[in-house]
A protein has these predicted regions:
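Structural motif corresponding to the intra-repeat A-B loop/turn of tetratricopeptide repeats
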Residues: 56, 93, 132-134, 138, ...
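TPR/TPR-like (Sel1-like) alpha-helical repeat modules
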Residues: 140-154, 223, 227-249, 259, ...
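Short solvent-exposed coil/turn linkers within tandem alpha-helical repeat scaffolds
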Residues: 72-80, 108-118, 135, 155-176, ...
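OB-fold single-stranded nucleic acid-binding module
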Residues: 307-310, 314, 328, 347-441
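Pro/Ala/Gly-rich low-complexity, hydrophilic intrinsically disordered segments
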Residues: 152-159, 257-258, 264-332, 417-445
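Residue-level recognition of tetratricopeptide repeat
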Residues: 88, 123-129, 186, 220-221
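N-terminal leader/linker segments that initiate helical-solenoid repeat arrays
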Residues: 25-83
Length: 445
């Protein structure tokens, strides 16, 4: 919290710097006119009391001075100066509730307050709102949004100082403009007005498309919608990952989070290699464009489950060979699954641990007779007797599909077991011939 307030104080000093000149001029005019009470709605004594408060350097003492002034002159025309002094003092005292209270009182004076002063106190109000606890932010969300919009309007009305070029003035207004839009976005978020938050965050991105935090926050807003807008959420998370302003640690952290969200969106059972491929494709797209292409999409867990419902190894072969979007969706659904009793013709057997069988997938006698080239390799684990499988024999195995090559078409299986009935029985060891004893020679007797 102390770090936040230190930053608030620095930013507020910058904001108030734009209005100090005009306020000083107005005070000077007030002092000159204050000597003639028929021309000014306050007395010189009243003016001097306000000036004494303005000169006070200790915030708590200044607040006491201002309290005494307001108690004595509750309807003073000098409140247009007194209320902003409260704002500055309470900011130094790290009291956001009072900053907000007196900023609102200043703005409530309407056109009596010049645009520069209104901008300054509304800027301070926005910074103070950011330091409130969540419950207080939620309670004050509607007023915070109104104040942010009023701040943008006041900032637009601030006249360029004579000593600044148009470009320099435009640059000075950029940070306050972003702050007001950010306040609008956060207030909309806590009020569960997610479309409103999207609008405010996008206003920031229109000024700074590469901003890490804004892209990330916008992704979170899309994810919080009902139903979640997953493609937009993924897109803006990816924009945050690829932000040129992100450190390596920040980029890695958001990338890890994005990957986990994609995996969850697809049911958590998609092969890691496929999730990595989808992530890399998304990052490449997001790194080259601020806006998500309407054609960009990822299959959901529901899409994948629908494919798996009626999927067989035969349909997997057909769909993968066909290529295109159907092939991609089928592979997402099939990769990592265990398929039972896959039929095939053994083309080659490589003993070892694991045993590797090269098999041609067949579904008919005609295909079996014609098969001479394998289109699958099958790693058999924990079944040493499978080494007895003979070349050109028919087998069935149950295994996990782990990879495939589109050209030439080839499937890769792991953790497989061959159907016991398809493994030839172990040949019995040949029996030893019986030992023949030599016939006893007849006795000579």
């Amino acid at each position: 919290m102390n770090g936040i307030w230190k930053r608030v104080g620095t930013l507020l000093a910058v904001a108030l710097g734009l209005i100090l000149g005009s306020s000083s001029n107005l005070r000077g005019q007030a002092a000159a006119g204050g000597q003639d009470s028929t021309k000014q709605p306050y007395t010189l004594v009243e003016y001097n009391a306000e000036q004494a408060c303005a000169a006070e350097k200790v915030p708590a003492t200044q607040v006491k001075c201002l309290d005494d002034f307001v108690a004595k002159y509750p309807s003073s025309a000098l409140l247009i100066y007194v209320y902003p002094l409260y704002v500055n003092a309470y900011n130094q005292m790290k009291n956001p509730d009072k900053v907000i209270e007196y900023a609102d009182k200043t703005v409530a004076l309407g056109d009596k307050v010049d645009a520069g002063t209104r901008y300054g106190v509304l800027y301070a109000r926005a910074l103070a709102y950011a330091t409130l606890k969540p419950d207080a932010q939620a309670a004050g969300a509607a007023k915070a949004r109104e104040a942010a919009q009023a701040g943008l309007k006041a900032l637009d009305e601030v006249k360029k100082p004579d000593n600044l070029t148009e470009d320099d003035f435009k640059k000075q207004k950029l940070q306050p403009t972003i702050l007001f839009h950010f306040t609008c976005a956060k207030a909309a978020e806590v009020a569960k007005d997610f479309p409103g938050a999207v609008q405010c965050y996008k206003a920031i991105l229109a000024l700074n498309p590469d901003d890490l935090s804004t892209n990330y926050n916008l992704g979170k807003v899309y994810m919080a919608m009902t139903p979640p807008q997953w493609m937009d959420a993924f897109w803006y998370f990816a924009r945050a990952v690829t932000s040129k302003s992100a450190t390596q640690a920040q980029s890695s952290q958001v990338k890890k989070y994005l990957r986990s969200q994609i995996a969850n969106y697809q049911g958590g059972n998609v092969c890691d290699s496929l999730t990595d491929g989808e992530l890399n494709e998304l990052l490449q797209l997001a790194g080259s464009s601020a806006d998500r292409p309407s054609s960009y999409t990822l299959p959901s867990a529901t899409d994948i489950s629908a494919i798996q419902k009626d999927m067989t190894i035969a349909s997997v072969f057909t769909d993968l060979k066909a290529g295109g979007d159907k092939s991609k969706l089928t592979w997402l659904a099939a990769c990592g699954l265990e398929f039972p009793e896959v039929p095939g013709k053994v083309i080659e057997v490589t003993p070892g641990d694991p045993i590797v069988l090269k098999i041609a997938f067949v579904t008919s006698d005609a295909e079996f007779d014609a098969a001479t080239t394998p289109n699958m390799d099958v790693k058999v684990v924990g079944q040493p007797e499978a080494a007895r499988v003979e070349k050109n024999s028919a087998v069935h195995f149950t295994g996990t599909l782990v990879a495939y090559d589109p050209e030439p078409f080839f499937l890769h299986w792991d953790k497989a077991k061959v159907k016991a009935e398809d493994i030839p029985k172990e040949k019995a060891a040949p029996k030893k011939p019986p030992v023949r004893r030599p016939a006893r020679k007849p006795s000579g007797r």
